[in-house]
Amino acid sequence: MHRFLSKKKIQHHIYVLNQVDHFRFNRAALINAGFLESSNSTDYIAMHDVDLLPLNEELDYGFPEAGPFHVASPELHPLYHYKTYVGGILLLSKQHYQLCNGMSNRFWGWGREDDEFYRRIKGAGLQLFRPSGITTGYKTFRHLHDPAWRKRDQKRIAAQKQEQFKIDREGGLSTVKYSVDSRTTLSVGGAPCTVLNIMLDCDKAATPWCTFG
């Protein structure tokens, strides 16, 4: 990514958000925490899955001034093709992310947080933009995800099956609870990088599916 962004002359700082607590994976809460911990010198964020790498240099990673820019659009993502999909790689100005109150913290386990975030984007009155003129189709990205790695995070437990389709109108960036266990700043192949080991907090009365078993 560093070579890719540097070639496009995009200044960047990579934040690796590593969940080190004993709860199930919560991508949205990690992104909320990463947003709060990121430097004030940044103008926008890239919510970028680590298992999705761009292969087409024509992809735009520039400042999404007009509104959220979904780099990994349904027409290009190798796996997810439904029209409301906004996962994988999404660029937002910090102002727009705050306008949405970030992402819902209720999604423990894999998936569905992006679908809820799509509704937040629309509810905030923002227009979603996607790439145009990209001719590489489903070969635009390299996708390294293997669901067998984290089987416990694929499960839908108890009321989670119903909750996953609801809109969280109260929680988000303003309510995420976490602590930073450690912070390491380093350079990887010349890329400026900060690794945050994050311990999330779970209200088990509200979301008992944060644990498994």
Tell what function each PLM region has.
Residues 106-109, 115-213:
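C-terminal catalytic/acceptor-binding lobe
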Residues 29-33, 91, 116:
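Acidic, Ser/Thr-rich intrinsically disordered and amphipathic helical segments
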